[in-house]
Amino acid sequence: MSKFEKEQIAFPNDFRRNYISDQLHQKYDHKTNTELIHLNVKVSVAGRIMTRRIMGKSSFMTLRDGGGCIQLYFTIHDMKSQTMYFKVIKTWDIGDLIGVKGVLFKTRTGELSIHCKEMVLLTKSLRSLPDKFHGLRNIETKYRQRYLDLIVNEESMKTFKIRSLIISEIRRFMHQHHFIEVETPMMHHIPGGALARPFVTYHNKLNMNMYLRIAPELYLKKLIIGGFEKIFEINRNFRNESISPYHNPEFTMMEIYEAYVDYNNMIIFVQELFRTLTERILRKSVIEYGDYSLDFEKPFIKMSIKEAIMYYLPDIRTKNIDDILVVFDILKFFKVPSDNQWTLEKLHMVLFEEIVSKKIIQPTCITHYPIEVSPLARCSNDNAKIADRFELFIAGHEIGNGFSELNDPDDQRNRFLKQATEKMINNDIDQDESNMPYDKDYIVALEYGLPPTAGVGIGIDRLVMLLTNKHNIRDVILFPTLRSK
């Protein structure tokens, strides 16, 4: 590097470009070489050298910038001196960042290229890039050094550009439907809003433990109480739990709340959102995900947990799954652990989650979740043991969870107290830390009146996986959580 410092400013910052590569391709790809010569299009571009072909007194390079790639051509006669030409071909390497000025032309094969008249080294790459054609063979390096993955893997860059577009389109859709975007705290006094183990931190000034949020739900419903009627938030949640191809401890979630609707209205709204996203992002409503074709044009399938069990497990259709002993036997057959204290409704849910859910391919809303595992959801008018709740499953995985909100402060207080009691008497750490604590402040807020409301949470990372055909959540998170080296 000292050699370059002596010969020029080591890291110049005075080069300015007037195009990026995709703008040139969009504007001039259809032109013939004769037309380009007549137009005499002068361009300034900057980017990273991705390939080099040295051919004696003339050379080619591929330059990659934020818009894509474009070919560069230069000869010994284009340089200020022969010394400059040989300096370029001998000391400029793949990975270096350069700026060039020149005119557009087309090669004999019809490729749009820049005939370079001026070239300047902007930043020297002091480390060799991975082989562009083989990429990063070490998967951990791909995630740990994402910048390298983005440099050599155009598919990764495309994925994260699509992710950004998806979030932009979600916001556009929400604003078109008159929802207001809000922000709620990332650090909570108590962990609430979902059943999950939190990350704990400590506030030195306040001399107290705080918790990275596991869900923003209670704060968002306080805003509905305050008078907002249609709100959403896109932000991070943190759960101190497992890491898997579908789980990252830090993940992006969108939560939506609307007053004066119920969970059935929310199903229709989510269906419209997903159909709009597939059409605007992928220009089609039937998309490919692995070996599956997922149809977002049709209304979402809707079935209860019991209906899903009977549909996806045809071998047990002759069995009476309203008999709790029969369900225990079915779980035992599938080697699914169970507890003899569980209710029939919870046994159904466990059987569904462990065996049935992975069989659901087309967008399907599963309903009739037990109230005992839905502490913030309203009870069904038809069955007090069942919540007005749905979960959206696509390609074998949960993508969203929504329900009609519980707005009875006495009922909510009793549910909080019941879980707090279970927390005190339960010696299992995992279960202990996943029980929802008693949130006195939320009960006070409910006593001022929460209108009939429905809400839904949608996992943005899993949604991006669907729309980019990725099967590991780490492929759609720029810097996923990894073990320290």
Curated annotation (Swiss-Prot):
Does this entry carry the keyword Ligase?
yes
Q: Which cofactor does it need?
A: Mg(2+)
Please provide the record's keywords in A-Z order.
Answer: Aminoacyl-tRNA synthetase, ATP-binding, Cytoplasm, Ligase, Magnesium, Metal-binding, Nucleotide-binding, Protein biosynthesis
Q: Which Gene3D superfamilies match?
A: Bira Bifunctional Protein, Domain 2, Nucleic acid-binding proteins
Q: Name one GO biological process term.
A: lysyl-tRNA aminoacylation
Which free-text remark accompanies the cofactor?
Answer: Binds 3 Mg(2+) ions per subunit.
PROSITE patterns registered for this protein in UniProt: AA_TRNA_LIGASE_II
Q: Which GO terms describe its cellular component?
A: cytosol
| A Pfam family assignment | tRNA-synt_2
Q: Where does Mg(2+) 1 bind?
A: 391, 398
Superkingdom of origin: Bacteria
The keyword Membrane appears for this protein:
no
Molecular function (Gene Ontology), one example:
magnesium ion binding
Under which EC number(s) is this enzyme classified? 6.1.1.6
Entry binding sites for Mg(2+) 2: 398
Supply the CDD domains for this chain.
Answer: LysRS_core (cd00775), LysRS_N (cd04322)
Q: Which reaction does it catalyse?
A: tRNA(Lys) + L-lysine + ATP = L-lysyl-tRNA(Lys) + AMP + diphosphate
- Report the subcellular localization: Cytoplasm
Q: NCBIfam families annotated for this entry?
A: lysS_bact, PRK00484.1
Q: Which family does it belong to?
A: Belongs to the class-II aminoacyl-tRNA synthetase family.
Complex and partners? Homodimer.
Question: Protein name, please?
Answer: Lysine--tRNA ligase
> Which species does the entry assign this protein to?
Blochmanniella floridana
